Amino acid sequence: LDLVEWANGDPATSKWAKMRADAGHPAPFNLKMIGIGNEDLIDPVFKNRFQQIFDAIKAAYPDIVVVGTVGPAPSGQDYEEGWKYAREAGVPIVDEHSYQSSSWWFHNLDHYDNADRKGPKIYLGEYGSWNTQLINGLSEAAFMGRMELNGDAVVMSSYAPLFAKNGH
């Protein structure tokens, strides 16, 4: 909660917002979303802790959208358990991550074609192909096109190679 207050609070009434202003940014950041979790094992401990944070944010800041997580891969036990939990908890958006071979991207172009349009929306928060050859770029581009076709389910994405340090 302190993070949200630091980002959005009024420096005249909030010690956290005053710290932000004193650090050189007096205007609020207008934070609208916050991610809780990152490639987590979806077990009872995670669910308990996530629920505590989720409930506290929703109570104090009902306009902030909480983005959940569905584990470290686009399939498997954590993925399935993460999706099940997100639906049960009413998480509005989940963050998926996927690093795969070019072959995987081509063979899974339909990955989001049957996504649940009534459940949590999808943020493909990290994705990329495992190499830097032309075929890898083509596979990623093909997958991006299919994400666009499923834009009612996949509402955001972040292409992992764009996170690289400039000049590195």
Please tell me what each predicted stretch does.
Residues 55-58, 62-65, 83-88, 92-168:
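Catalytic-core region of carbohydrate-active enzymes that cleave or remodel glycosidic bonds
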Residues 1-64, 68-82, 88-89:
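N-terminal catalytic cores of secreted or lumenal carbohydrate-active enzymes
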